[in-house]
Amino acid sequence: MRSGVIAQKVGMTRVYNDAGEHIPVTVLRLDNVQVVAQRTEDKNGYTAVQLGAGQSKVKNTTKALRGHFAAANVEPKAKLVEFRVSPENLIDIGATLTANHFQSGQLVDVTGTTIGKGFAGAMKRHNFGGGRASHGNSVSHRAHGSTGNNQDPGRVWKGKRMAGHMGQTRVTTQNLEVVSTDEDRGLILVKGAVPGSKGSWIIVRDAVKSAAK
């Protein structure tokens, strides 16, 4: 099990393959990703590496974190993420991870925080069909309808799909293909859409499930 990387979502574009077909891709940028700390079985009870990405001003960094970064001899980072790894895949503190950490054609799992949509109704949030446009409908065109029975069960079931806050949740999209990488510019091009807004932090890992054949 290898470490993943921390990236920033730049946006979407398209590239063309050898057959002239266009492929929609999301551009992810690696911004000075370095190993800040290690976790070992002897000391911590598990094996992991802590990565830092981006750059943070010293005045905006807490005193405790300043000491943490100084011990690793790295500049203060804007984002810290820990990745579980197998003991043979531990990376030295201070090492820099680049875009060639991934190879073209491999599958990755991408984690991000979806764009918040605020308070949304059941039709937008859960794709409900809504009520009838006319013929007996009284101000219930977009209502979610009944939420439960009468005496039994006498309550609303947990998990009942209703109106509420939509988006702003942590989502992992699995088995996205790496179309290409650019080590010089620190770019990874991933096929398809990735959760999150432009500029948001994204976590990219090796895929844990093989794609369905």
UniProtKB/Swiss-Prot annotation:
Q: Which taxonomic lineage does the organism of this UniProt entry have?
A: Bacteria, Pseudomonadati, Pseudomonadota, Alphaproteobacteria, Hyphomicrobiales
- State whether it acts alone or in a complex, and with which partners, per the record: Part of the 50S ribosomal subunit. Forms a cluster with proteins L14 and L19.
Xref: SUPFAM superfamilies? Translation proteins (SSF50447)
Q: Which GO BP terms, alphabetically?
A: translation
Q: Which Gene3D superfamilies match?
A: 3.30.160.810, Translation factors (2.40.30.10)
Query: What are the record's GO terms for cellular component?
Result: cytosolic large ribosomal subunit
Q: Which gene encodes it?
A: rplC
Question: Which PANTHER family does the annotation name?
Answer: 50S RIBOSOMAL PROTEIN L3 (PTHR11229), LARGE RIBOSOMAL SUBUNIT PROTEIN UL3C (PTHR11229:SF16)
* Record PTM N5-methylglutamine, positions in chain: Q151
Family the UniProt entry places it in = Belongs to the universal ribosomal protein uL3 family.
Its biological purpose is as follows: One of the primary rRNA binding proteins, it binds directly near the 3'-end of the 23S rRNA, where it nucleates assembly of the 50S subunit.
Q: What is this protein called?
A: Large ribosomal subunit protein uL3
Cite the Pfam families for this sequence: Ribosomal_L3
Region annotated Disordered sits at: 131-155
**Compositional bias of type Polar residues: which residue ranges?**
135-152
